[in-house]
Amino acid sequence: MKKTAHIISHSHWDREWYMPFEGHRYYLIQLMDDLLELFATDPNFRSFHMDGQTIMLEDYLNIRPEKEAEVRKYIQDGRLVIGPWYILQDAFLTSAEANVRNLLYGIKDTETFGQKREQIGYFPDTFGIYGQAPQLLAQAGIRAAVFGRGVTPTGFNNQVQHDDYSSPFSELIWEAPDGSQVIGILLANWYSNGNEIPTDEDEAQTFWVKKLRDAERFASTSQLLFMNGCDHQPVQKDVTQAIKVAETLFPDVAFKHSNFHDYLTQIKEELPKELQKITGELRNQKTDGWSTLVNTASARIYLKQANDRCQTLLTNVLEPMCLLVENKSLHRDFSEYYWKLLMENHPHDSICGCSIDAVHREMKTRFEKVEAGATTFIAEQGKEIAAQINTLHDSEEAIPLVVLKTNGTSGKRVVRHKVAMKKIYFDEMDFRHIPDRLKEIVMPTYRLEFPNKGSVPIEVQDAGVRFGYDLPRDGFRRPYYARELEVTFSYDSDLYLGYECGFLVPVEEKQTEARKELIGDPSMNTLENEAMKVMIHRNGSYSILDKTTGFEYRHLGIYEDVGDIGNEYMFKASSDGVRYTTEACEASIRIIENNSLCATVEICQTLSVPAAADERLKEEQERLVWHPDRKAGRSKERTDITLRTELTLEQGAKGLKVNVNIDNTAKDHRMRALFPVERARGNHYADSIYEIVERPNTPDPKWQNPAFDHHMQRLVSLDNGEYGLTIATKGLHEYEIVSDSIAVTLLRSVGELGDWGLFETPEAQCFGQNEAQFVLLPHKGDVLSANVYVAAYDDPVEPTVIQTEQSMGPLPHATNLFQWSGEGLVLTACKPTMDGRGMILRWFNPKREGEALIVQSTHFLQIYRSTILEEQIEKLGTENVQIEVRPQEIVTLRFE
């Protein structure tokens, strides 16, 4: 059969990487100008693939808005191919819902520009891909995925080498854990195998002999794929002339300036009946381990933590809150703006922390804009909701507190909020005297009561005097000073999405009931609640006794420091091989807080480590020595690193909260926290995208890298069959299982980008204050059988508390939009539909068996099963529906 060579012109566009965004944008404008001219002058130049993303159009049209009609025309003609993504994201370091928003807004852009062509799941350079990608794509009607990494190893020089784990063909079947399948197209010869095609006959002869042979080696059909482009590659203007030369030299091959639509149509007609099936995540599991790029999970951890905060704000607070307000279009517009701004930080070279320092400084500003904007929006919209509620109380002195519950699950937790007991505005008296006047006020005793619950346990502390201001919608700003209280209360709610009003009521009688403090004997360095007992040791490590099982987890929280002579992409241990730990430290321990609802202990340790790598590392960096071949050790000069660890135990909590502050004074090193689980079994679990995946503790025999690090989203869990320990983190995405211990990376300090040149990155050393937050959750059995992952997902999402005035609003004291049940199911989305006509709820089932989902809502007329793109599939019922959620299935319901 005659071979067909499909030549697809493209440019893989890293929006920011070895230059800042604006530097790369200059060349994007050149590329697009040249491309539009080529479309106009060369009718044989059929199409150009815009790297699977739509943000490139925004970046271009912001500079050249007059080109929009021309761009739109070529998109509608099928010559300029965009989407389906808004940006080419890193798959593992962005949340499940962020991956879906990326697809939603990308598809919306393609429809806005009038693109009619079917989409492909495009992952040309993604640093590994989550296992549920086939299910997500299939639910969006996308039946093929193109990817360059994850099955065969890829080096920093962007060359892919064949490996037995990959399919023998470029074409394969990729299956998600739930059984969903897509056709997988492996870019086995990388996304530049047809780059810069010669027009000179002699050069073309040499070029095509090699390229055709390489492509035929992996092709299961007569259709051969050649990607005519590479990173930031200018469009090849004479590619159609080069094709004519090739046709003359190789008459037995049909050379075609093509696109993915035509290529996929052709190969589907010829695919063999039996293709290799690859199931689940693609992480280079069976390679030598040196080119996985997994340690981007720990480069510049501060970026990952900011991203986690922003994703949580948008997914778990701002979007659900939209369903409680009248002006849903305002919410929808702000939500899209904040999501798109946040996703500017989600390309792999951005969120992975593997770019030059200037790129990541700009990222910090974007995160700050999203966080500040979303926080303001939530606060102001919360005030508008609160102003509509009936907040009258028998006592005129009662302070109404509206609790907005937006996480979509019921449950109990300890809530902390600052309340203005008394405000004095600057227009009421001379501002210079206000603080003293406020300090004279005697703080009364308070109780907190809810109309449907009565009084709840509460702790109140004087928080002093604070400056603030109001911004009335119909007037000039009003500055004030306020006397504040810090109110901590136990909140047990059966709300899923809604609000209820509580009242902070002053009472004359003093508290007489004795409340048991969580630290009974301060000299014993022990915290204890109903579920666990925490014993702190002299070296600063601690043990947890799970009171429900009687199992003790010993010597948790020892810190380990080793040299790192790698780069932003990959960790490489220094050649000295020395581990420095806090095991022999003498820690200082002090109580920060101790009451009936919450206790916090601070542990302070000093660890002496080498100040940097030795001078050999500089030489190896300058000579571009590949990281596995480096031999540098650590310097003789020493420096002290101060670690401050806060352990917090709350009433009723099943987990111990840990906050670590590292004052980093060293370079070229990695610091981890160690959590042993005695007699751990050979596999463990980690949170991924719509999946809790099971992974082996030890690598495949082909693995040569001494380190076997992994990605996680929210949690990692290790058990011994009877008892387990789950660690739920906030923005910590790297771990390793080492000798029956979970090692969580808290800090990684390196000084260069890596890859194809020498790009120094001194800010990637992360000097100064570094924070890490996580929760330790002991349990019986494994993480799935114990359902402990539900608490892990819920931990970052706190209720929003709004202080308001007493008023006779039209809304009742409490409202709940829906309720649901389904043991072990995880709710990931609670948002307005993109078209503004209803509500979207999404769950996934992490378990290996099916589960019934029951949903009730009296606020909507119809309930539909929906695609991931929020399109109706079938009507399920009205107020009450029950469906079966298959093992590891993602389910989306649409309410109208």
UniProtKB/Swiss-Prot annotation:
> Which keywords has UniProt assigned to this entry?
Glycosidase, Hydrolase, Metal-binding
Taxonomically, the superkingdom here is Bacteria
Catalytic reaction annotation:
(2R)-2-O-(6-phospho-alpha-D-mannosyl)-glycerate + H2O = alpha-D-mannose 6-phosphate + (R)-glycerate
Q: Which residues bind a divalent metal cation per the record?
A: H12, D14, D125, H348
Q: What are its cofactors?
A: a divalent metal cation
> How is its cofactor bound, per UniProt?
Binds 1 divalent metal cation per subunit.
- What EC number(s) does its UniProt record assign? 3.2.1.-
| Keyword Transferase recorded | no
Q: What does this protein do?
A: May hydrolyze 6-phospho-mannosyl-D-glycerate to mannose-6-phosphate and glycerate.
Family per similarity comment:
Belongs to the glycosyl hydrolase 38 family.
Identification of the protein by name: Putative mannosylglycerate hydrolase
Give the gene name: mngB
